[in-house]
């Protein structure tokens, strides 16, 4: 018996938090090696769309809308698996990344290494073409 998408999300026992007036949770995406690619917020609707399509959808607080990762760049994230954290307010996705994950052209959004003695950051890694 196949469950509908809303029932699947309900069974995930998630705790969406009130962030900027929206019910959201944190989504972390990693590649198969475990390297963190990016973090973003998800609404219930973006989670449902991700499950339905097999590709990552997020909720942009700055644009106040749902968006499919790669809708402009073509750098999509195909879902391999997902883990829920112990509190139910964050999801960790393993994805197959097409192209780069960061909108600045880096594989990971975490390319700014911070020196804790100065607070200054240095870019590590190269931009991808």
UniProtKB/Swiss-Prot annotation:
GO cellular component: cytoplasm
Pathway assignment: Amino-acid biosynthesis; L-histidine biosynthesis; L-histidine from 5-phospho-alpha-D-ribose 1-diphosphate: step 3/9
Necessary cofactors: Mg(2+); Zn(2+)
Residues the record lists as binding Zn(2+): 86, 102, 109
Protein name: Phosphoribosyl-AMP cyclohydrolase
Reaction equation(s) it catalyzes: 1-(5-phospho-beta-D-ribosyl)-5'-AMP + H2O = 1-(5-phospho-beta-D-ribosyl)-5-[(5-phospho-beta-D-ribosylamino)methylideneamino]imidazole-4-carboxamide
Quaternary context: Homodimer.
Top-level division of the source organism's lineage: Archaea
Species lineage: Archaea, Methanobacteriati, Methanobacteriota, Methanomada group, Methanococci
List of residues binding Mg(2+): 85, 87, 89
InterPro entries referenced in this protein's UniProt entry, alphabetically: PRA-CH (IPR026660), PRib_AMP_CycHydrolase_dom (IPR002496), PRib_AMP_CycHydrolase_sf (IPR038019)
One GO BP: L-histidine biosynthetic process
Co-factor note (free text): Binds 1 Mg(2+) ion per subunit.
Transmembrane region(s): none
């Amino acid at each position: 018996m196949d469950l509908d998408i809303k029932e699947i999300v309900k069974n995930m026992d998630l705790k969406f938090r009130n962030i900027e007036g929206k019910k959201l949770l944190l989504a972390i995406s990693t590649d198969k090696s475990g390297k963190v690619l990016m973090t973003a917020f998800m609404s219930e609707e973006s989670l449902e769309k991700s499950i339905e399509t097999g590709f990552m959808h997020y909720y942009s607080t700055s644009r106040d809308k749902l968006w499919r990762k790669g809708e402009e760049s073509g750098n999509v994230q195909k879902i391999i698996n997902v883990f829920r954290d112990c509190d139910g307010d964050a999801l960790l996705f393993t994805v197959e990344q097409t192209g780069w994950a960061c909108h600045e052209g880096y594989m990971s959004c975490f390319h700014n290494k911070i020196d804790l003695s100065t607070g200054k950051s240095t870019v590590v890694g190269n931009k991808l073409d």
